[in-house]
C-alpha cells in the first residue's frame, strides 16, 4: 500500500499541537439524527458498540444537546412521537434521496439514463435530443427532446446492489449511521430516489426545490470545462440547504480531459475540499477504466453497453506511482477536515480501508469534503462505481436533520413570553421581542408511527388533474387518508398516491417517512406543509429568486379562456414565472429568469393550450432603491365638508440589505408607543408603505431595499380613518424618498463564454463594447473560457453576435448576479423619459 507522506519540519512540535487540537475539538457539528422518545442507538447496543469511542462521545453530546434544545421550547402535548422501530431502521439505512445537478451540457441526463439502465429500470439506453426518435427517459417533454435540454426536473426511483468500499466490515463512524457489519459484508439492495434537474440558469427554481427535499446530490462536472457559472450556482444552492455531495467528473473521453484541473477548481472556485477516489486508466479516446484508490483495484466496464464490471488486483505498472500519489493526496485532504484522520496522519499510521472509507463518509455527510469519481456516461464507463459511491458516502434520511416550526397557539405564546422575559424590564423592548418572537422549532424523525409531516415541493398539471410532488419527512402517508394543509387549515382526502418514473406512474397504497411521492387531486401551492391534523407543524419553504426580465404578451386573435388558464397554471407550477397587467398600457406582462425561460412558456401555450401569442421586446427588470437614511414628518389632511381625512406619521426610511435566506429586502417596522397612532391604523400604515413601493419616483419601477420605521404620529377622533393613514404613509414615503438619494438599479449578469482560442480577441472586444467587466480568463490547449459581468440591458442580441464572431463555434451562458446602480447619465435619461411620459398623461 502507500506510505503516508512525512511532515516536513518540527515533527515533535507538530505532534504536540495536533494532539492538543484533537483533545479540544468537538464532533457535535456532524449531522446527527436523534429520536426524541427513544434513540436508535439506545435501542441497538450492538450497533452502538461497533462505533468508535469518539463517535459514541459525539452521539451522547448530540443527544443531550437535542434534548436540552427541544424540551423547554414546547410542552409534551405538542411533541411529535419519534420512535424509530427496527423496521424503520432496516428500511432507512438502505435508502437514498439524491439529485443530479450540473451546468448545462455536463451530461446529467445522459448519466441518469445509464443509472436507470444499469439498475434495470429501463430496458435500453436512449440519448438526449431524441437522436433515435425515442429520447432520454427523463426528458419526457417534447420541447426537451427537441432542444436537447432539461426544462423540468423529473423524478424516478430504482434499486441498486451496491459494492461496499471494502469486502470487510465498513464502520461508518457517524453517530447516526446504524448500518451493521453484516450489512456491509456483502452487496446490499439500496432503494434510490433520483431527481434529474435542469442545468440552464433560467430553470434554477427546479434545482432549488429539488435540493430543498433531497438528502444528497451528485455534482456532475465536465472533464474539459470544469467548474462553470451554473456549477457555482448549484454549489450555492447545495450549501443553502446543507446538502452533502459527491462529485462525478464526466466526459473523460473528450479531447482535453483533465480531471486534476477540475478537482483544483472544486477546491479553489467552490471552496470545497475534494480529492479523487479513483484515477483514470487512459484518457480521451484511450479512456479505459479507473483505479479504485480505496480498495486498490483496477476496474473496467465490459459487455453490452458497459453492463459488466471486471475488477483486478493488478494495477497497471504505468499508473502505479500516480495511484500512490493520488491516494496520499486523498489522505492528506481528509486529514485537513477530519480529526481522526489527522491523528493517524500525525502518528504516521496508514489508515485501513475501513478507516479511509469511514472518514470519507463522515466528512461527506458533514459537508466538509466531496469524494470525486471519474467516468464517461456516453461511453458507459464509471457509472456503476458512482452509484456505489451514492450508497456508501451519501446519507440516509435518518442522518439528515429535519425540523418544523410548531405553530400551535400554546407554543407560539410560550415562545413570545420567553422572548419578552429575555428582553428584561424595558417594556418597549419586551413588546418588540414578543412581536418578533419566532415559533419554536422541533426536530422531525423519520418514524413510520409518528404524526405525518410532509412538504409539497413541486406541482404539475397531469392527465387527471394537479399532480403534487411531496417529500414525507415523518409518519406515513396513505391513500384515502385525510391530510391538513398547514398554510390554509383545509383538510383534503388523498384519492390517489403514486411513485413517479419520469412521466410514468406506479400506484401505491402508502409512502413511508423519508420517501418521495406524488398525489393526485390535492389542491395546494408549492412549499405547503401537510400534516395529519394532530400537530400544527409547518416547514420552511424554499428560496425563490426574483424575476429579472419581462415582456408583453398578447394572444393572436380573440383572447380566450385558454390564455388565462395557461397563465394561471404556469404561475402555480413555477414560482419564478410572474404575470401582471400593466395599469398604464393595460398589457399583460410576463416575467421570468431569462429569455429562454419566457420563450419556453410562450411555446408551451401554443402547443398545450392552442394559444399562439405575439410578444413585445424584452424588458429589463429595473428597480429603484435609496442610498441613505431620511426622516419624515408628514400630515395628510383633507376637508370636504362633513367628515374629513386626517393622519400624521413620523419616522424615517433607511437602506436595507437583502436577507440571503428569504430574499426579503423590504420591511415595515412599527415602533409607535403610547397609542399616538391607534393600533387599528397600523396595518393601514403598512399597506400605504407597500403601495408606495410599487412605483419609484425616478423611473416608475418597483422600489426595493428599504426599511420603513414608524416612530410616532397623531390621529383625530373624527377625521382619522384607515384610508387617511394609508395615504399619509404613502405620502410620507414619497417625501422622504427624494431626500434619501434614490438610484435606479439594473440586473447585472455573470456571463461565461467558451470559444476556440483564435477568437479570444474578438470575444473580449465585443464584451468591452457592451460595457462588460472581465473577471476571469482561462486558456486551455485549443479553447478558452472567459467570465465577465455585464448589464442585462446590454446583453440583448449577444447570441447572434457571438455566432458571427466565432463562426458558430462559441457558446455562452449567463446568470443573474445582483442589481447594481446604473450609470448617472443613464439614470438621467430614464428619469427624463419617465417625467415626459407622466406629463403627457396629464
UniProtKB/Swiss-Prot annotation:
Alphabetical UniProt keywords: Elongation factor, GTP-binding, Mitochondrion, Nucleotide-binding, Protein biosynthesis, Transit peptide
Predominant location: mitochondrion
Domain tr-type G per the UniProt entry, residue ranges: 93-398
SMART domains documented for this protein: EFG_C, EFG_IV
A GO MF label: GTP binding
GO biological process: mitochondrial translational elongation
Cell compartment(s), UniProt: Mitochondrion
Pathway: Protein biosynthesis; polypeptide chain elongation
GO cellular component, one term: mitochondrion
Pfam families, per the entry: EFG_C, EFG_III, EFG_IV, GTP_EFTU, GTP_EFTU_D2
Stretches the record annotates as Disordered: 423-442
Residues that bind GTP: 102-109, 196-200, 250-253
Gene3D superfamilies: 3.30.230.10, 3.30.70.240, Elongation Factor G (Translational Gtpase), domain 3 (3.30.70.870), P-loop containing nucleotide triphosphate hydrolases (3.40.50.300), Translation factors (2.40.30.10)
Sequence similarity: Belongs to the TRAFAC class translation factor GTPase superfamily. Classic translation factor GTPase family. EF-G/EF-2 subfamily.
Role: Mitochondrial GTPase that catalyzes the GTP-dependent ribosomal translocation step during translation elongation. During this step, the ribosome changes from the pre-translocational (PRE) to the post-translocational (POST) state as the newly formed A-site-bound peptidyl-tRNA and P-site-bound deacylated tRNA move to the P and E sites, respectively. Catalyzes the coordinated movement of the two tRNA molecules, the mRNA and conformational changes in the ribosome.
Name this polypeptide is given: Elongation factor G, mitochondrial
Amino acid at each position: 500500500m502507500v506510505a503516508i507522506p512525512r511532515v516536513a519540519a518540527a515533527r515533535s512540535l507538530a505532534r504536540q499541537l495536533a494532539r492538543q487540537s484533537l483533545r479540544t475539538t468537538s464532533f457535535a457539528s456532524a449531522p446527527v439524527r436523534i429520536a426524541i422518545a427513544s434513540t436508535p442507538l439506545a435501542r441497538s447496543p450492538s450497533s452502538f458498540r461497533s462505533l468508535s469511542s469518539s463517535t459514541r462521545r459525539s452521539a451522547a453530546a448530540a443527544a443531550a444537546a437535542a434534548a436540552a434544545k427541544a424540551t423547554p421550547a414546547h410542552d409534551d402535548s405538542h411533541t411529535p412521537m419519534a420512535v424509530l422501530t427496527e423496521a424503520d431502521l432496516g428500511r432507512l439505512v438502505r435508502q437514498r434521496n439524491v439529485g443530479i445537478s450540473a451546468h448545462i451540457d455536463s451530461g446529467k441526463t445522459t448519466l441518469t439514463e445509464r443509472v436507470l439502465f444499469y439498475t434495470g429500470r429501463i430496458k435500453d439506453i436512449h440519448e438526449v435530443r431524441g437522436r433515435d426518435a425515442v429520447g432520454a427517459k427523463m426528458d419526457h417533454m417534447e420541447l426537451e427532446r427537441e432542444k436537447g435540454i432539461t426544462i423540468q426536473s423529473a423524478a424516478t426511483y430504482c434499486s441498486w446492489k451496491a459494492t461496499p468500499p471494502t469486502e470487510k466490515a465498513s464502520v461508518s463512524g457517524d453517530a447516526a449511521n446504524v448500518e451493521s457489519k453484516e450489512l456491509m459484508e456483502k452487496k446490499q439492495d439500496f432503494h434510490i430516489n433520483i431527481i434529474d434537474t435542469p442545468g440552464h440558469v433560467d430553470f434554477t427554481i427546479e434545482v432549488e426545490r429539488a435540493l430543498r427535499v433531497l438528502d444528497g446530490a451528485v455534482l456532475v462536472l465536465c472533464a474539459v470545462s470544469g467548474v462553470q457559472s451554473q456549477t457555482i450556482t448549484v454549489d450555492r444552492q447545495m450549501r443553502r440547504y446543507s446538502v452533502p455531495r459527491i462529485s462525478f467528473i464526466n466526459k473523460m473521453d473528450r479531447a482535453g480531459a483533465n480531471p486534476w484541473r477540475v478537482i483544483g477548481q472544486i477546491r479553489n472556485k467552490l471552496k470545497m475540499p475534494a480529492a479523487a477516489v479513483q484515477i483514470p486508466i487512459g484518457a480521451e479516446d484511450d479512456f479505459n477504466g479507473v483505479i479504485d484508490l480505496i480498495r486498490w483495484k483496477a476496474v473496467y466496464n465490459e459487455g453490452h453497453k458497459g453492463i459488466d464490471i471486471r475488477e483486478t488486483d493488478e494495477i497497471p505498472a504505468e499508473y502505479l506511482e500516480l495511484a500512490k500519489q493520488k491516494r496520499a493526496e486523498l489522505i492528506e485532504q481528509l486529514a485537513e477536515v477530519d480529526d481522526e484522520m489527522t491523528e493517524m496522519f500525525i502518528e504516521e499510521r496508514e489508515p485501513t480501508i475501513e478507516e479511509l472509507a469511514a472518514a470519507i463518509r463522515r466528512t461527506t455527510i458533514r459537508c466538509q469534503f466531496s469524494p470525486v469519481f471519474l467516468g464517461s456516461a456516453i461511453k458507459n464507463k464509471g457509472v456503476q462505481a458512482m452509484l456505489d459511491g451514492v450508497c456508501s458516502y451519501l446519507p440516509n434520511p435518518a442522518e439528515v436533520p429535519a425540523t418544523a416550526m410548531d405553530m400551535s397557539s400554546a407554543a407560539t405564546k410560550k415562545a413570545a413570553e420567553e422572548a419578552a422575559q429575555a428582553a428584561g424590564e424595558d417594556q418597549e423592548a419586551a413588546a418588540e421581542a414578543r412581536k418578533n418572537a419566532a415559533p419554536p422549532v422541533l426536530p422531525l424523525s423519520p418514524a413510520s408511527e409518528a404524526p405525518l409531516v410532509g412538504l409539497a415541493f413541486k406541482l404539475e398539471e397531469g392527465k387527471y388533474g394537479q399532480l403534487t410532488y411531496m417529500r414525507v419527512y415523518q409518519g406515513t402517508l396513505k391513500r384515502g387518508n385525510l391530510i391538513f394543509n398547514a398554510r390554509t387549515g383545509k383538510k383534503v382526502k388523498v384519492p390517489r398516491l403514486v411513485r413517479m418514473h419520469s412521466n410514468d406512474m406506479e400506484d401505491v397504497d402508502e409512502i413511508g417517512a423519508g420517501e418521495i411521492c406524488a398525489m393526485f387531486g390535492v389542491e395546494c401551492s408549492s412549499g405547503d406543509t401537510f400534516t395529519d391534523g394532530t400537530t400544527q407543524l409547518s416547514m420552511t419553504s424554499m428560496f425563490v429568486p426574483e424575476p429579472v426580465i419581462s415582456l408583453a404578451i398578447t394572444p393572436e386573435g380573440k383572447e380566450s379562456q385558454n390564455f388565462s388558464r395557461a397563465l394561471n397554471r404556469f404561475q402555480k407550477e413555477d414560482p419564478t414565472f410572474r404575470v401582471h397587467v400593466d395599469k398604464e398600457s393595460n398589457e399583460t406582462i410576463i416575467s421570468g429568469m431569462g429569455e429562454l425561460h419566457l420563450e419556453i412558456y410562450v411555446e408551451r401555450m401554443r402547443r398545450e393550450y392552442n394559444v399562439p401569442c405575439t410578444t413585445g421586446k424584452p424588458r429589463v427588470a429595473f428597480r429603484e432603491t435609496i442610498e441613505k437614511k431620511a426622516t419624515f414628518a408628514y400630515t395628510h389632511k383633507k376637508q370636504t365638508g362633513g367628515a374629513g381625512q386626517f393622519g400624521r406619521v413620523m419616522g424615517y426610511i433607511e437602506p436595507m440589505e437583502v436577507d440571503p435566506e428569504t430574499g426579503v429586502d423590504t420591511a415595515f417596522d412599527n415602533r409607535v408607543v403610547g397609542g399616538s397612532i391607534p393600533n387599528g391604523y397600523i396595518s393601514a400604515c403598512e399597506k400605504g408603505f407597500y403601495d408606495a413601493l410599487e412605483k419609484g419616483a425616478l423611473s416608475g419601477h418597483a422600489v426595493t431595499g428599504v426599511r420603513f420605521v414608524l416612530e410616532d404620529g397623531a390621529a383625530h377622533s373624527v377625521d382619522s380613518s384607515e384610508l387617511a393613514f394609508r395615504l399619509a404613509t404613502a405620502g410620507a414615503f414619497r417625501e422622504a424618498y427624494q431626500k434619501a438619494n434614490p438610484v435606479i438599479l439594473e440586473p447585472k449578469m455573470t456571463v461565461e463564454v467558451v470559444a476556440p482560442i483564435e477568437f479570444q480577441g474578438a470575444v473580449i472586444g465585443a464584451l468591452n463594447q457592451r460595457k462588460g467587466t472581465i473577471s476571469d480568463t482561462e486558456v486551455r490547449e485549443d479553447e478558452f473560457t472567459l467570465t465577465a459581468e455585464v448589464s442585462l440591458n446590454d446583453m440583448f442580441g449577444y447570441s447572434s453576435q457571438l455566432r458571427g464572431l466565432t463562426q458558430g463555434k462559441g457558446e455562452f451562458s449567463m446568470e443573474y448576479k445582483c442589481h447594481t446602480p446604473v450609470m448617472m447619465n443613464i439614470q438621467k435619461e430614464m428619469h427624463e423619459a419617465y417625467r415626459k411620459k407622466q406629463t403627457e398623461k396629464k
